[in-house]
From Swiss-Prot:
This is Ribosomal RNA small subunit methyltransferase D. One of its GO terms (molecular function) is nucleic acid binding. Belongs to the methyltransferase superfamily. RsmD family. Keywords: Methyltransferase, rRNA processing, S-adenosyl-L-methionine, Transferase. Specifically methylates the guanine in position 966 of 16S rRNA in the assembled 30S particle. InterPro entries: DNA_methylase_N6_adenine_CS (IPR002052), RNA_MeTrfase_RsmD (IPR004398), SAM-dependent_MTases_sf (IPR029063). Its EC number is 2.1.1.171. SUPFAM superfamilies: S-adenosyl-L-methionine-dependent methyltransferases. It catalyses: guanosine(966) in 16S rRNA + S-adenosyl-L-methionine = N(2)-methylguanosine(966) in 16S rRNA + S-adenosyl-L-homocysteine + H(+). It is an enzyme of class 2 (transferase). It comes from Buchnera aphidicola subsp. Acyrthosiphon pisum (strain APS) (Acyrthosiphon pisum symbiotic bacterium). Pfam families: Cons_hypoth95.
Amino acid sequence: MNNSFFRKNSKIYIISGNLKGRKISFKNIPNLRPTTNQIRETLFEWLSKYIKNSRCLDCFAGSGVLGIEAISRYAAFSTLLEIEKKTFLTLKKNIKELNIYNVEIIRTNTLHWLKKTRNKPYDIIFIDPPYHQGLVKKTINLLENKKWIKKNSFIYIEQEKKQSIIVPKNWTLYKKKITNQIQCYLYICST
């Protein structure tokens, strides 16, 4: 096993934009797997024409790297949802150290928040939940049924390999990448 797993804290770096090279610290806790540099680079290359001035929602923020990377690449705003207290507190600390103000961090159960909160739809939504908990399907259903998505919204899904995925008929697959361990999909809402 990788020795970094046993360290109390780890860090990843923002790979592009006005925060390029800045670090994001995170606690090594079960189920926290920040999206790798390679996958993030691919994802944000896919989104490069659409990220500027977008409103982003990071449904299971964890390290917050997806929402923060979006801000670094000139997204207008990111909402980060995280339930785990230590991870949430680390996220708050990172946002303060990065001196960014167009990020909202909410300590909440993502499914509960999507069900109960009223907000306007997001342009880009990141879904990268803990594995083996059936959260992708539940999140997709809430995003669609509670009108969190609008025409031309992008929805990024990262999940363990060999898990099936069923999306609404009005979502069109825009890009996909499959590695040894994960599968990544970027959909666009057509209606």
